[in-house]
């Protein structure tokens, strides 16, 4: 706890006041103070930066660097790794880009890859990146969008726009980003619905029901349209438009984005139930007719849709309330719960996809924290802070970051899970940024006022007696910023 001296901008006599003056007029001031003084946030941030500094693979259970994971901790990696190492990671995915523009799911040291296993991944090799072997999980449609989003984060945080002109195998990064998005329009776009497609999975998951492993499209695949893939595309287009040097790209993709947003609302949003439908099936459903899939509420896809600007504030509030209700019904710990209700036993041939197992109802901070991002960005600060806290507490309890959790809070999957570390850091930073800027004024603007209290003082300094009617505006002080006391 910090103990900072009182600072006054105008000399004058005053009595001790409470830390925020009349906090009853603005409850958000209490939330602001709690965020700024929360030691758990600082602890988790330090832990997250430490584990990301130890590598770029997804976690200790994975040998690969996955693009959908790296997309969620690249900003933390930029804090703790040399710039060249971050660039090389991004570049590696472009080295393995297919002729049609597709992006691989992940890559690993070629010496550790079993290239000849007929039951394993179908590896892709690159003459310009021979030290690695890459592969693509074909049931999911978020690799291209994840890479575009990751490059966007790198450029925005580093301000290194010149990176977009880096040439990889004869094409610039900017050109390759455009081709990655175009691949989705050429190979995954369904003209009837005006949306992109993929295999049947559980929300944002990458396991299809029709195979014991379930990571590759085959003759048994049931093709679908879902909210997660399409919301990720809307986000990626927004990102690409913002940083593209060639303005023709912006004009081209803006019209595509508008059509996608219209068609998402038209075909995937159930206005009566106030939720996204799980799937639009293009060649039948893999699930029995006795199972009403439309009762399933997808938490992760809904969170990404919020980030993509697809829901109104009223709909966001309803979605958050629905998630909290689902958490209670599932006896889970956080809104990282992937869905409720789950798919019944036997719905997936992969034995790990039992009810409340893995992506079928597991509790994933990796997506729950993205809902925190969306709440914060849309002004639901109190809700975001309260719903983030159990995620932070769980990390401390387990002394580390984990891939997912059972409803009872048991850690499962990969340990040292960098995706969880990354999304929590962004959630923390988003709330801190709000708190630091909420009603903040410059020292110049505050001239003529006085500072009575600094955040971080002991309670004895914060709970004085008596009333004081100041002649000038009164401010609170915290780490170089001033805030009106009432």
Model-derived features with residue positions:
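Bacterial N-terminal signal peptides that target proteins for export
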Residues: 1-8
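Alpha-helical support elements that line or immediately flank enzyme active sites
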Residues: 69-100, 301-313, 369-391
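Bacterial N-terminal signal peptides
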Residues: 8-18
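Acidic/polar, glycine-enriched structural segments that form the non-catalytic walls/loops
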Residues: 20-63, 161-185, 244-245, 251-252, ...
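Cell-envelope and extracellular/periplasmic
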Residues: 441-486
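The feature captures the catalytic groove of carbohydrate-active enzymes
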Residues: 54-62, 70, 111, 115-146, ...
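Catalytic cores of carbohydrate-active enzymes
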Residues: 25-48, 65-66, 103-106, 189-198, ...
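Short, solvent-exposed loop/turn and secondary-structure capping segments
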Residues: 76, 85-89, 105-106, 462-469
């Amino acid at each position: 706890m910090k103990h900072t001296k009182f600072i006054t901008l105008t000399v004058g006599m005053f009595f001790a006041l409470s830390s925020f003056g009349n906090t009853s007029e603005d409850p958000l001031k209490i939330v602001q103070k709690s965020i700024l003084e929360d030691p758990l946030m600082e602890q988790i941030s330090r832990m997250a930066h430490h584990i990301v500094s130890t590598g770029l693979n997804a976690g200790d259970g994975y040998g690969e660097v996955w693009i959908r994971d790296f997309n969620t901790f690249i900003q933390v990696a930029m804090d703790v790794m040399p710039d060249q190492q971050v660039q090389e990671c991004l570049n590696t995915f472009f080295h393995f880009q297919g002729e049609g523009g597709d992006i691989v799911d992940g890559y690993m040291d070629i010496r550790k890859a079993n290239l000849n296993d007929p039951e394993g991944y179908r590896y892709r090799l690159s003459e310009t990146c021979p030290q690695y072997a890459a592969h693509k999980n074909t049931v999911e449609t978020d690799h291209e969008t994840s890479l575009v989003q990751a490059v966007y984060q790198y450029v925005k945080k580093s301000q290194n726009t010149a990176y977009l002109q880096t040439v990889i195998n004869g094409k610039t990064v900017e050109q390759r980003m455009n081709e990655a998005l175009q691949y989705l329009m050429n190979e995954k776009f369904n003209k009837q619905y005006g949306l992109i497609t993929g295999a049947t999975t559980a929300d944002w998951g990458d396991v299809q029901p029709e195979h014991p492993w379930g990571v590759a499209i085959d003759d048994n695949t049931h093709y679908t349209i879902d909210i997660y893939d399409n919301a990720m595309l809307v986000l990626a287009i927004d990102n690409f438009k913002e940083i593209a040097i060639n303005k023709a790209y912006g004009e081209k993709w803006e019209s595509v984005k508008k059509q996608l947003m219209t068609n998402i609302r038209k075909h995937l949003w159930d206005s009566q139930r106030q939720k996204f439908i799980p799937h639009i099936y293009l060649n039948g459903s893999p699930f029995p007719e006795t199972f009403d899939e439309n009762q399933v509420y997808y938490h992760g896809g809904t969170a990404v849709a919020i980030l993509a600007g697809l829901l109104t504030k009223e709909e966001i509030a309803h979605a958050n309330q629905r998630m909290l209700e689902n958490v209670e019904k599932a006896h889970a710990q956080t809104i990282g719960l992937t869905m409720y209700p789950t798919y019944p036993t036997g719905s997936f041939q992969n034995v790990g996809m039992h009810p409340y197992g893995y992506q079928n109802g597991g509790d994933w901070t990796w997506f729950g924290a993205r809902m925190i991002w969306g709440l914060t960005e849309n002004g639901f600060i109190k809700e975001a802070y309260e719903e983030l806290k159990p995620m932070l507490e769980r990390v401390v309890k387990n002394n580390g970051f984990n891939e997912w959790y059972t409803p009872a809070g048991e850690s499962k999957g990969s340990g040292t899970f960098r995706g969880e570390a990354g999304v929590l850091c962004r959630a923390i930073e988003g709330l801190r940024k709000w708190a630091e800027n909420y009603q903040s004024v410059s020292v110049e603007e505050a001239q003529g006022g006085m500072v009575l209290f600094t955040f971080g003082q002991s309670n004895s300094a914060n709970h004085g007696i008596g009333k004081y009617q100041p002649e000038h505006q009164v401010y609170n002080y915290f780490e170089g910023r001033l805030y009106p006391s009432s």
